[in-house]
């Protein structure tokens, strides 16, 4: 039986082997709002620091408030993304289970097809062997008849 490639391996095995940058990109694709919230929070902190440095306390306070709101948004995005990703993972696992069953069914059908073809080949070989035997018998019978014909011709000559 040939090796069937596994198309339903989990990503967890591959995730451990990924380099850091690839892991980061993978997770950012899984939960795109979290990096956006983090960048927005960082921007708010930077603007608040710049306003503090310039002496504009009122704008600095506004940007610090934005920082808190954006951190809250990031946290909510993180929790919501984890929940959504968890439900999608369960759906994917059930889908993967269906794919496994389908692959197993295809494998069984392929095995049955191979067995059917093997039986057909055996039947053809048996028929060919019978035909060879029959041809051999016919050849022997033909040689006997030719011998009888020669004998009869010799008798007629005498």
Swiss-Prot record:
GO biological process: mitochondrial respirasome assembly
Domain of life: Eukaryota
Pfam families for this protein: HIG_1_N (PF04588)
Residue ranges that the Swiss-Prot or TrEMBL entry lists as coiled coil: 88-158
Major localization listed first in the record, in broad terms: mitochondrion
Record localization: Mitochondrion membrane
Any one of the GO CC terms: mitochondrial membrane
Membrane topology: Multi-pass membrane protein
Keywords: Coiled coil, Membrane, Mitochondrion, Transmembrane, Transmembrane helix
Region annotation (Disordered) ranges: 128-158
InterPro entries cross-referenced by the UniProt entry: Hypoxia_induced_domain, RCF1
Domain HIG1: 5-96
Gene3D superfamilies, A to Z: 6.10.140.1320
Signal peptide boundaries: none
Membrane-spanning ranges: 32-52, 68-88
Family: Belongs to the RCF1 family.
Role of this protein: Cytochrome c oxidase subunit which plays a role in assembly of respiratory supercomplexes.
Assembly information from the UniProt record: Associates with the respiratory chain complex III/complex IV supercomplex.
Name assigned to this protein: Respiratory supercomplex factor 1, mitochondrial
Organism: Kluyveromyces lactis (strain ATCC 8585 / CBS 2359 / DSM 70799 / NBRC 1267 / NRRL Y-1140 / WM37) (Yeast)
């Amino acid at each position: 039986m040939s090796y069937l490639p596994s198309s339903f391996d989990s990503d967890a095995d591959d995730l451990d082997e990924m380099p850091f940058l690839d892991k980061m990109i993978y997770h950012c694709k899984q939960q795109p709002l979290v990096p956006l919230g983090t960048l927005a929070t960082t921007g708010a902190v930077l603007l608040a620091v710049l306003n503090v440095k310039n002496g504009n306390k009122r704008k600095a306070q506004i940007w610090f408030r934005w920082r808190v709101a954006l951190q809250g948004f990031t946290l909510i995005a993180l929790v919501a993304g984890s929940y959504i990703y968890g439900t999608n993972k369960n759906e994917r696992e059930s889908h993967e289970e269906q794919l496994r069953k389908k692959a197993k069914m295809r494998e069984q059908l392929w095995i049955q097809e191979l067995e059917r073809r093997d039986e057909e080949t055996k039947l053809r070989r048996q028929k060919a062997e019978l035909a060879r035997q029959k041809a051999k018998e016919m050849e022997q019978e033909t040689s006997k008849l030719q011998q009888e014909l020669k004998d009869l011709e010799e008798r007629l000559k005498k």
